Amino acid sequence: MKPIFDINETFEKQLKDLTSNVKSIQDNLLEEIITPNTKTEYLQRFLIDRFDKELFKKNVPIVSYEDIKPYLDRVVNGESSDVISARTITGFLLSSGTSGGAQKMMPWNNKYLDNLTFIYDLRMQVITKHVKGVEEGKGMMFLFTKQESMTPSGLPARVATSSYFKSDYFKNRPSNWYYSYTSPDEVILCPNNTESLYCHLLCGLVQRDEVVRTGSIFASVMVRAIEVLKNSWEELCSNIRSGHLSNWVTDLGCQNSVSLVLGGPRPELADTIEEICNQNSWKGIVKRLWPNTKYIETVVTGSMGQYVPMLNYYCNDLPLVSTTYGSSETTFGINLDPLCKPEDVSYTFMPNMSYFEFIPMDGGDKNDVVDLEDVKLGCTYEPVVTNFAGLYRMRVGDIVLVTGFYNNAPQFKFVRRENVVLSIDSDKTNEEDLFKAVSQAKLVLESSGLDLKDFTSYADTSTFPGHYVVYLEVDTKEGEEKETAQFELDEEALSTCCLVMEESLDNVYKRCRFKDGSIGPLEIRVVRQGTFDSLMDFFISQGASTGQYKTPRCIKSGKALQVLETCVVAKFFSI
């Protein structure tokens, strides 16, 4: 197949070619994927020994991860890749394991990294077009690598970001502004994420005048970095003043590389940073510490949207740029309007990434799956992916809304995860519904001088009737360093939160709750400060990645519930 992307062509022409020829690119891509795979054990049950798009769509079933897991497990345990893929499977990508339960292992090969590198180069061009002067400095990016595991077959299993950072693609990346970071590679590759995060902050502070952008993959990680800064700035200043890294950082790569960045004692710089951090309010702290920062690059769509107010507070309303929509299955596309408001972010799907189909979610026949070029404006769909690593017509589990078109390429807004729900009876509360309800509670908290830091939930069926439990971590409005137990909780406000949350839920919930009596009163359990950091630490200990971590909005793990329950300081009901 002729390459879709010619690095020597202009950016505008590259983008126009991709987005104007969606159908032909998708058809050619599907043929390229399927033709060598018709003899695999999986596909030969459905296809004759040649490519035929109509037969593919008619015979090959739409599947979930559980449907193909037996085939993947065979490769994991040592059988040949051609059980499911004619192209050699060189490893497995781990999902975050926080949205829908246990981690999934997706097959991958270098085609995934080819696509990822393509997207990185494309989004660099997009940002260059929209953000002036961004080429004149470095990025303070909170990027992490997680220790990989090995499958019985000897293939690595790791998260997508680790696969990229440990690859030759990253090692031999272009020497331009977008790949220029304040942190040495050794900090990114450090397997101890606590040490890595501290070193990211230290290197960024030393080079504070060179930073033109900062960020992380997800907004939650950016917020955590700021929280670590709040708790560690005195130690960081001490390191800068002395020119020596703290002894508790034991990773040799970090020790050696960060020492070079420190470059000896810098007492005047330490004094400047200390004066900034010592001020009463941390509003705008990012812009004050890194005055040349032009934008924050991090995902703020979906469940990450709740962190937008906190980032706006700390970053003094710098643009929050959500660049890319991707998953362990594939990279979907990029945001071509990077300076738009977080609530307006849409991603233009790139037709050369994978073969995309869509299950309609607005009623009608869900078997009437449509191609990328046939989606309709204003309709919602679940994407289905066929990729180069052995996934054929696999449901992704996301729900997306068509918001427009760039030439012929559809643009999608991420709406929610399909499989994250609370349910006691006939009620089905998805992540979007829960987020809207919590947003109403957040307004009540703010009127009482409290900020919502994070939340999660679970359906408690140990009582009769069962009821929704929502865990909230709150803080004082100005972010003062106090334990939750040390400032007075407004009992009336929190009881009101229970009521407004119930009022925000749908009619099925209200019928079950107030008419049928099949759901009990909604409960809020307030947890002490630092609880959601502990929850993150738990999931990381179970295999989740620091860089890709998202707070689960519905807890399914009994052990994770124990982490939360040990931190509860108060309970409120909607009675």
UniProtKB/Swiss-Prot annotation:
Any one biological process term the GO annotation gives: positive regulation of plant-type hypersensitive response
Function as written in the Swiss-Prot or TrEMBL entry: Catalyzes the conjugation of specific amino acids (e.g. Glu and possibly His, Lys, and Met) to their preferred acyl substrates (e.g. 4-substituted benzoates), in a magnesium ion- and ATP-dependent manner. Can use 4-substituted benzoates such as 4-aminobenzoate (pABA), 4-fluorobenzoate and 4-hydroxybenzoate (4-HBA), and, to a lesser extent, benzoate, vanillate and trans-cinnamate, but not 2-substituted benzoates and salicylic acid (SA), as conjugating acyl substrates. Involved in both basal and induced resistance in a SA-dependent manner.
Family note: Belongs to the IAA-amido conjugating enzyme family.
Residue ranges the record marks as coiled coil: 6-33
UniProt pH dependence: Optimum pH is 8-8.5.
Binding positions for AMP per the UniProt entry: S95, S96, T301, T324, S328, Y347, D398, R417
Gene Ontology molecular function, alphabetical: N-(4-aminobenzoyl)-L-glutamate synthetase activity; N-(4-hydroxybenzoyl)-L-glutamate synthetase activity; N-benzoyl-L-glutamate synthetase activity; N-vanillate-L-glutamate synthetase activity
Assembly and binders: Interacts with the P.syringae pv. maculicola effector HopW1-1 (via C-terminus).
Taxon lineage: Eukaryota, Viridiplantae, Streptophyta, Embryophyta, Tracheophyta
Induction remark: By P.syringae pv. maculicola and pv. tomato. Induced by PAD4 locally at the infection site and in a salicylic acid-dependent manner systemically.
Keyword Coiled coil in annotation: yes
Annotated signal sequence range: none
Residues engaged in binding salicylate: Y120, D121, L122, R123
Superkingdom, taxonomy of origin: Eukaryota
UniProt-recorded name of the protein: 4-substituted benzoates-glutamate ligase GH3.12
Activity regulation info: Specifically and reversibly inhibited by salicylic acid (SA).
Enzyme class: ligase
PANTHER family, per database record: 4-SUBSTITUTED BENZOATES-GLUTAMATE LIGASE GH3.12, GH3 DOMAIN-CONTAINING PROTEIN
Keywords: Coiled coil, Hypersensitive response, Ligase, Plant defense
Gene disruption: observed consequences: Enhanced susceptibility to virulent and avirulent bacterial pathogens P.syringae pv. tomato and pv. maculicola ES4326 with or without DC3000(avrPphB, avrRpt2, avrB, avrRpm1, or avrRps4) as well as to the oomycete pathogen Hyaloperonospora parasitica (downy mildew) isolates Emoy2, Hind4, Hiks1, Wela3, Cand5, and Wand1. Impaired hyper-sensitive response (HR) and systemic acquired resistance (SAR). Compromised salicylic acid glucosides (SAG) accumulation. Resistance is partially rescued by SA treatment.
Tissue expression pattern: Expressed in seedlings, mostly in cotyledons, leaves, hypocotyls and sporadically in roots. Not detected in unchallenged adult plants, except in flowers.
Ligase as UniProt keyword: yes
Enzyme Commission (EC) number: 6.3.2.-
